[in-house]
From Swiss-Prot:
PROSITE patterns: HTH_ARAC_FAMILY_2, RESPONSE_REGULATORY. Residues 3-118 form the Response regulatory domain. The modification 4-aspartylphosphate is found at D55. It comes from Staphylococcus aureus (strain NCTC 8325 / PS 47). Pfam families: HTH_18 (PF12833), Response_reg (PF00072). GO terms for molecular function: DNA-binding transcription factor activity; sequence-specific DNA binding. Residues 153-250 form the HTH araC/xylS-type domain. InterPro entries: CheY-like_superfamily (IPR011006), Homeodomain-like_sf (IPR009057), HptR (IPR051552), HTH_AraC (IPR018060), Sig_transdc_resp-reg_receiver (IPR001789). GO terms for cellular component: cytoplasm. Disruption phenotype: Deletion leads to impaired growth when the available carbon source is limited to glucose-6-phosphate. Deletion also alters antibiotic susceptibility. Member of the two-component regulatory system HptS/HptR that regulates genes involved in hexose phosphate transport system in response to changes in extracellular phosphate sources. Activates uhpT expression to facilitate glucose-6-phosphate/G6P utilization by directly binding to its promoter. Antagonizes CcpA-dependent transcription of a subset of CcpA-regulated genes involved in antibiotic susceptibility. It is found in: Cytoplasm. The gene is hptR. This is Transcriptional regulatory protein HptR.
Length: 252
């Protein structure tokens, strides 16, 4: 669901953080690594991650310069530092950062920070989604937070976690102990629409939050789980009665 860029010139540190931290537990499903600020800036501009973890002292472009370059972006930052420059960094950097961590990184401490961050991100995402959904009739079925059926809630949660992938109904119900026919029937009874319909509406809803972030429309289609742009465009028109381009013009 979320993305992180880990930037450190020491390979053992950046790869260690990538491999040791259970990122999936904190809803981070895409982890990028960079060996300096130049690589990190390119990744950040391309993928717009929710979190950047960066060292301060690196070749080519250091962490301070990187922070200056991304100050206008909406991303959270965790700074890594050695003992020698830790106090200087806290006093001298004027950017708002999520937290500072001394090397060697305390993985337990990092996970505490991630836990706090993901709660904030999920709440922001939920609020944004509810705000957008309330403005369009097509998204009304997505507004309900919880249903009185365990299996339906499990399927909805799975959709929200995996909508960005080329997921199928079988994929969505593989972790619950019921047949596909029972799951589909129960979902329709409680939600009023099919699982596939809910998935596609949710994908289009999420796409609205990306349309003003300077992505190409085919990039947005891929980011919200559509294998082809024409399928994204078809469902967009189906639910909103206009094309993505017309929606952007109307929103200006």
């Amino acid at each position: 669901m979320f993305k992180v860029v880990i930037c450190d010139d020491e390979r053992i540190i950046r790869e260690g953080l990538k491999q040791i931290i259970p990122w999936g537990d904190y809803h981070f499903n895409t982890i990028y690594t960079a060996k300096d600020g130049v690589e990190a800036l390119s990744l950040i501009q391309q993928h717009q991650p929710e979190l950047v973890i960066t060292d301060i002292r690196m070749p080519r472009k250091n962490g301070v310069d990187l922070l200056n370059d991304i100050a206008h972006l909406d991303c959270n930052v965790i700074i890594l530092s050695s003992y020698d420059d830790f106090e200087y960094m806290k006093a001298g950097i004027q950017h708002h950062v999520l937290d500072y961590l001394l090397k060697p990184v305390d993985h337990a401490q990092l996970e505490v920070i991630l836990g706090r961050l993901v709660r904030t991100l999920l709440e922001q995402q939920s609020q944004n989604g509810r705000s957008l959904a309330s403005c369009h009739d097509a998204f009304q079925p997505l507004l309900k937070v919880e249903y009185d059926d365990y299996y339906v809630n499990q399927i909805v949660d799975q959709i929200k976690q995996s909508y960005q992938t080329k997921v199928t109904v079988s994929d969505l119900i593989q972790h619950i102990d019921v047949s596909e026919s029972y799951a589909m029937r129960t979902f329709k009874d409680h939600v009023g629409i099919t699982i596939v319909d809910y998935l596609n509406r949710y994908r289009i809803l999420q796409s609205l939050q990306l349309l003003d972030r300077h992505y190409k429309h085919y990039e947005i289609a891929d980011k919200v789980g559509f294998s082809e742009y024409k399928m994204f465009s078809y469902h967009f028109k189906k639910y909103l009665q206009m094309s993505p381009s017309d929606y952007c013009k109307q929103a200006k």
